[in-house]
Amino acid sequence: MVKFPALTHYWPLIRFLVPLGITNIAIDFGEQALNRGIAAVKEDAVEMLASYGLAYSLMKFFTGPMSDFKNVGLVFVNSKRDRTKAVLCMVVAGAIAAVFHTLIAYSDLGYYIINKLHHVDESVGSKTRRAFLYLAAFPFMDAMAWTHAGILLKHKYSFLVGCASISDVIAQVVFVAILLHSHLECREPLLIPILSLYMGALVRCTTLCLGYYKNIHDIIPDRSGPELGGDATIRKMLSFWWPLALILATQRISRPIVNLFVSRDLGGSSAATEAVAILTATYPVGHMPYGWLTEIRAVYPAFDKNNPSNKLVSTSNTVTAAHIKKFTFVCMALSLTLCFVMFWTPNVSEKILIDIIGVDFAFAELCVVPLRIFSFFPVPVTVRAHLTGWLMTLKKTFVLAPSSVLRIIVLIASLVVLPYLGVHGATLGVGSLLAGFVGESTMVAIAACYVYRKQKKKMENESATEGEDSAMTDMPPTEEVTDIVEMREENE
């Protein structure tokens, strides 16, 4: 068997990240399978794709913050009591999300948000609100799955997490194929992707919960001991979670904002509906080569030996911060290569759209330029993920909050300014998203530098204090020092 000693320190990182990367890519494939379920409907396919895209992107705004409870499970859940608190938080959050879904579906608020703000016609608006109502229970199921995924990641069960997500996608693809041959294609085509989404989530949630009970539940204590900092309080969990939730909420609301501005820019015409449909089709395809880089932020908390919660998990790896940095750089280079191969090689991106989503060639050609813009996303995404993971390890997530605000400001500014430069449609949307990513990553880098300087100053002060104390207590008398020097001279 061939061995690579230079890679010894990186195998744990590879084994940990690869399943998570596959998970992220699998989610994108799942989205494409759902889009194919709509595109296969011959009548009003573009209108249905736009309606589902609007509803799905709004729903992602509610589920986004909950998926970051994975990081709470990764960092804070050290006992059964901690896990109960995390699950309780997610039950409440899921109920609140369901209430908002219902309000948007039935109230004037939903009519204003979807019909008026997006300038879509009555048909698209009513289909979007109906789809949003059907998706009301999904945030709760998604939250339960992600909470247990974080606990499994803490114990290095990333392979199980990856298998759960792949099972989710397989279930979605299977149910799309089954439902396309049912009466739903004629009576309620929107239910084809939505029911498939629910079945996939049910499979994923069940797999993760069973994995937790089989592998972890019996080995963790009922309560956390003092060596792990004691039981985590709900307040600590929420203080850690809210900046991450705010960031992910702004990431998820970015898509609805883009859809809104792109649609309004084109005046709610058929071109606007087509542009939103292009964005719906290109998001998962463009996200696929770089989306997995987001999972890099789980690496620092999982492998950093200064994190007290890692004492619970027995490990013999020798991964250092330097190894993590080099590994992160290689991941970014790999992602950039994938992006340029997929989106800049002639006819490759069109073939992906035609074969996977099932759109026609004319529609696929309209997606080429937006997809090429996605090629530049890996750099800001990698910077953000790497530094966020480091700050999560230090439990200093509060400094990340301003980055989400800057992202939205840059995004909206780009959506307003670029049309004056002749940029419209899906190209306007994806270009503005890139500008928002760059702005957010820049602010995260500034926040990380601020924390690093504070940490360095704190360590220098502690070292100086310890040096003074040791000088006062450990210094032998002057006569003893003289005797020691004389003895050394005699021996020489």
Curated annotation (Swiss-Prot):
InterPro entries assigned to the protein according to its UniProt record, in alphabetical order: ANKH
Segments for region (Disordered): 458-492
BP-aspect Gene Ontology terms: ATP export; bone mineralization; calcium ion homeostasis; cementum mineralization; diphosphate metabolic process; gene expression; inhibition of non-skeletal tissue mineralization; locomotory behavior
TM region(s), chain numbering: 86-106, 132-152, 159-179, 190-210, 327-347, 351-371, 404-426, 430-452
Locations listed in the record: Cell membrane
Membrane topology classification: Multi-pass membrane protein
Keywords: Cell membrane, Deafness, Disease variant, Membrane, Transmembrane, Transmembrane helix, Transport
Residue intervals on the Extracellular side: 107-131, 180-189, 348-350, 427-429
Cytoplasmic side: 1-85, 153-158, 211-326, 372-403, 453-492
Function: Transports adenosine triphosphate (ATP) and possibly other nucleoside triphosphates (NTPs) from cytosol to the extracellular space. Mainly regulates their levels locally in peripheral tissues while playing a minor systemic role. Prevents abnormal ectopic mineralization of the joints by regulating the extracellular levels of the calcification inhibitor inorganic pyrophosphate (PPi), which originates from the conversion of extracellular NTPs to NMPs and PPis by ENPP1. Regulates the release of the TCA cycle intermediates to the extracellular space, in particular citrate, succinate and malate.
Similarity-based family: Belongs to the ANKH family.
Record's disease association: Chondrocalcinosis 2: Chondrocalcinosis is a common cause of joint pain and arthritis caused by calcium deposition in articular cartilage and the presence of calcium hypophosphate crystals in synovial fluid, cartilage and periarticular soft tissue. CCAL2 inheritance is autosomal dominant. Craniometaphyseal dysplasia, autosomal dominant: An osteochondrodysplasia characterized by hyperostosis and sclerosis of the craniofacial bones associated with abnormal modeling of the metaphyses. Sclerosis of the skull may lead to asymmetry of the mandible, as well as to cranial nerve compression, that may finally result in hearing loss and facial palsy.
Protein's name according to its UniProt entry: Mineralization regulator ANKH
